């Protein structure tokens, strides 16, 4: 990745100025700030996104944080610790407040946290989840990888070939005061062995795969850029993410 790690200090988020808050007619797309956080420990992001969500106001811009974590297992609030099959794996386990069971984050995986005001965007939780899933499916399709949802199993799965049914992306959200945090992960090119020490997302024997194993040669940063564009387009209700204007993507390392 080209972006260096940054310190996350989420004091009260800044509200836009009065001129920026006046919506034109017809209304423009709601702004989204994208923060490229480099390699950042999971605990720092977890604490920061909760603090950001607690401090935000109705005028706070939505944000997407894009990050790569050192190795860590995370267990959702209703997760069963028995899904961690190897107690002495050497990889830390963090209990978190998102939905879902256990998953793994590590180098070579894109993690995108969506800090979104659902009420302002008039989104139901299920609609947000569907739009996130569609953004991931479109991202993978951009690299000639066919993928699909699976009923009753959040995330995105390989649709065809010898790895059909393998999980390539995970998703888990928390909604507090009408705003989301946590998000999704996409496996680009990573060491998949830590997934063997868990029942991924609570499913025994579920194969986990990455884009590189399926023949995709794109690097982490290229895929992350594609994913962010798809996510922003779908947050605005777009059906063709390729139409996203360049100026709509605000990037920040602050």
UniProtKB/Swiss-Prot annotation:
Tell me if Nucleotide-binding is a UniProt keyword of this record.
no
What does the record give as its pathway?
Answer: Protein modification; protein lipoylation via endogenous pathway; protein N(6)-(lipoyl)lysine from octanoyl-[acyl-carrier-protein]: step 1/2
CDD domains listed in its UniProt record:
LipB
GO biological process assignments: protein modification process
Q: Which transformation does this protein catalyse, written as a reaction?
A: octanoyl-[ACP] + L-lysyl-[protein] = N(6)-octanoyl-L-lysyl-[protein] + holo-[ACP] + H(+)
Function, please? Catalyzes the transfer of endogenously produced octanoic acid from octanoyl-acyl-carrier-protein onto the lipoyl domains of lipoate-dependent enzymes. Lipoyl-ACP can also act as a substrate although octanoyl-ACP is likely to be the physiological substrate.
> Other comments?
In the reaction, the free carboxyl group of octanoic acid is attached via an amide linkage to the epsilon-amino group of a specific lysine residue of lipoyl domains of lipoate-dependent enzymes.
Q: What is this protein called?
A: Octanoyltransferase
């Amino acid at each position: 990745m080209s972006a260096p790690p940054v310190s996350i200090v989420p004091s009260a988020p800044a509200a836009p100025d009065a001129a920026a808050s006046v919506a034109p007619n017809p209304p423009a797309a709601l702004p989204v700030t994208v923060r490229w956080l480099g390699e950042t420990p999971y605990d720092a992001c977890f604490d920061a996104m909760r603090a950001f969500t607690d401090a935000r106001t109705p005028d706070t811009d939505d944000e997407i944080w894009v990050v790569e974590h050192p190795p860590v297992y995370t267990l959702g609030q209703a997760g069963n610790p028995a899904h961690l099959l190897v107690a002495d794996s050497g990889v830390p386990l963090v209990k978190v407040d998102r939905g879902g069971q256990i998953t793994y984050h590590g180098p070579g995986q894109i993690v995108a946290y969506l800090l979104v005001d659902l009420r302002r965007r008039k989104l139901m939780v299920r609609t947000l989840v569907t739009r996130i899933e569609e953004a991931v499916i479109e991202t993978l399709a951009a690299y000639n990888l066919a993928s699909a949802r699976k009923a009753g199993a959040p995330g995105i799965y390989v649709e065809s070939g010898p790895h059909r049914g393998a999980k390539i992306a995970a998703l888990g959200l928390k909604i507090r005061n009408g705003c989301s945090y946590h998000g999704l992960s996409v496996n680009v090119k990573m060491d998949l062995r830590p997934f063997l020490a868990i029942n991924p997302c609570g499913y025994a024997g579920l194969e986990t795969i990455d884009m590189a194993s399926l023949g995709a040669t794109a690097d982490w940063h290229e895929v992350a850029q594609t994913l962010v564009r798809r996510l922003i387009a779908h947050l605005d209700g777009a059906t063709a993410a390729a139409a996203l204007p360049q100026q709509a993507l605000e990037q920040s390392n602050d």
